[in-house]
């Protein structure tokens, strides 16, 4: 218990700066026309401002603290976004505009894959975004709820794809990851399912 308390007390949350909604970017049509998947990344890190802009574009608060930039079924907001970096793993809290530390250290290998199959290009990207479906918020684990959660995770991932294309970042949507390892690391229940991920970074010149 003492070790747990000590670990929590040492957690380093990141209060993100306000999103820059006037940042220079391509139009939606231009982003759609040029969007493509990228699997090689520069080692350049993303600043806190860039992380704020990225997370907001993915599933941030759009208005009135009750709506998100990405739609969800019945506005259930059941998609949780986790940010894997070299230093730690964070959960993005949209209302607070905060990255809440959930685990220290570099755990991006879990996003790359399993011992049987891994795509190590993921380790080049400074950030990986992992989408988790919280079925509790959808009302159950029936087939319909799972399907709606998967659709909503796809909506979130497409926000990643289009935002990255619009501002000069790059990404690729993926389903491969060590689901069991991520679930254990994040302390998820059997109703909280890691479903998709997007490594994000700058293109490698």
Task: Go through the PLM ranges and name each one.
Residues 9-10, 184-185:
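Short linear sequence motif anchored by a di-proline
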Residues 10-125:
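N-terminal amphipathic, basic helical "cap/leader" segment at the start of enzyme domains
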Residues 19, 132-134, 201-203:
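Generic beta-structure capping elements
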Residues 35, 54, 81, 127-138, ...:
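Small-aliphatic-rich amphipathic alpha-helix that forms the alpha element of a beta-alpha
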Residues 124-127, 191-193:
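Short coil/turn connectors at secondary-structure junctions
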Residues 187-205:
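A glycine-rich helix N-cap at a beta->alpha junction
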């Amino acid at each position: 218990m003492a070790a747990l308390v000590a670990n929590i007390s040492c957690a380093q949350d990141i209060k993100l700066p306000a999103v820059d909604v006037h940042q220079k970017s391509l139009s939606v049509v231009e982003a759609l026309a040029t969007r493509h998947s990228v699997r090689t990344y520069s080692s350049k890190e993303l600043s806190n401002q860039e992380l704020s802009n990225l997370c907001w574009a993915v599933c941030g608060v759009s208005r009135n603290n009750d709506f998100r930039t990405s739609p969800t079924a019945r506005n259930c907001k059941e998609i949780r976004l986790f940010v894997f970096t070299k230093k730690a793993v964070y959960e993005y809290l949209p209302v607070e505009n905060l990255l809440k530390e959930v685990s220290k250290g570099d755990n991006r290998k879990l996003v790359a894959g399993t011992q049987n199959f891994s795509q190590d290009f993921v380790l080049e990207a400074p950030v990986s975004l992992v989408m988790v479906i919280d079925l509790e918020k959808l009302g159950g684990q029936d087939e319909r709820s799972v399907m709606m959660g998967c659709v909503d995770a796809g909506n979130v991932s497409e926000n990643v794809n289009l935002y990255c294309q619009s501002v000069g970042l790059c990404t690729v949507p993926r389903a491969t990851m060590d689901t069991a390892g991520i679930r254990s690391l994040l302390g998820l229940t059997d109703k909280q399912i890691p479903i998709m991920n997007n490594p994000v970074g700058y293109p490698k010149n």
